[in-house]
């Protein structure tokens, strides 16, 4: 039985729903993967792995800077619904005690809303992402039209509900 089958997963990853503006959002930053081949071109929320002894929020800021060259201001966490939540394992890292979204390969993912630290910053593709797109939030089904990684679909649905769209 895998970790995800038991309701627990091991490694924590973090991602951000980067909005153009947290107060009055009109667009969301969506990142198309470069690899592996079976996921190339599929979209995800940008982020990455939390290193040992690193707080999730610190990891997210570091990963966004490294992966897409974007400094952000974090907003609230997008809380996972209880029926989808994956519990933190015993001996988890600092700040890693919250339930998380199930992610690919048995990882657990926590997601925060965010906005660019410097208005007008757009980020850059490269490395893990072949392209970045700022997608309009209206109409709400526009986000669902993108070819998302399967694990990100429930997160996108919860995000749209959170925005009340």
Where are these regions (language model features)?
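Residue-level signal for short segments within beta-strands and strand-turn junctions
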Residues: 18-20, 32, 115-116
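A short coil-to-beta-strand element that immediately follows conserved catalytic motifs
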Residues: 71-81
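A generic structural signal for short hydrophobic patches within well-formed alpha-helices
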Residues: 50, 140-143, 156
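Conserved N-terminal beta-strand and adjoining loop/helix that marks the start
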Residues: 2-28, 49, 80
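Conserved Nudix-box catalytic region and its N-terminal flanking loop in Nudix hydrolases
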Residues: 24-67
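Charged phosphate-binding loop/patch that engages nucleotide di/tri-phosphates or the phosphate backbone
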Residues: 145-165
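Short, low-complexity, intrinsically disordered N-terminal peptides in bacterial proteins
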Residues: 1-10, 22-24, 91-97, 101, ...
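Active-site-adjacent beta-strand/loop module that shapes the phosphate/pyrophosphate-binding cleft
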Residues: 11, 82-122, 128, 133-140, ...
């Amino acid at each position: 039985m895998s970790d995800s089958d038991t309701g627990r997963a091991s490694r924590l990853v973090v991602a951000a729903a980067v909005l153009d503006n947290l107060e009055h959002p009109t667009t969301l930053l969506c990142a198309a993967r470069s690899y592996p081949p079976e996921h190339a071109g599929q979209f995800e929320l940008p982020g990455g792995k939390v290193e040992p002894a690193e707080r999730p929020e610190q990891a997210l800021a570091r990963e966004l800077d490294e992966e897409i060259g974007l400094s952000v201001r974090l907003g609230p966490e997008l809380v996972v619904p209880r029926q989808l939540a994956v519990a933190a394992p015993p001996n988890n890292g600092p700040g890693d005690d919250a339930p998380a979204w199930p992610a690919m390969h048995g990882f657990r993912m926590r997601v925060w809303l965010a906005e660019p630290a410097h208005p007008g910053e757009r980020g850059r593709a490269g490395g893990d992402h072949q392209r970045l797109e700022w997608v309009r939030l209206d109409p709400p089904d526009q986000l669902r039209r993108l070819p998302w990684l399967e694990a990100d679909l429930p997160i996108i649905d919860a995000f749209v509900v959170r925005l009340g769209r």
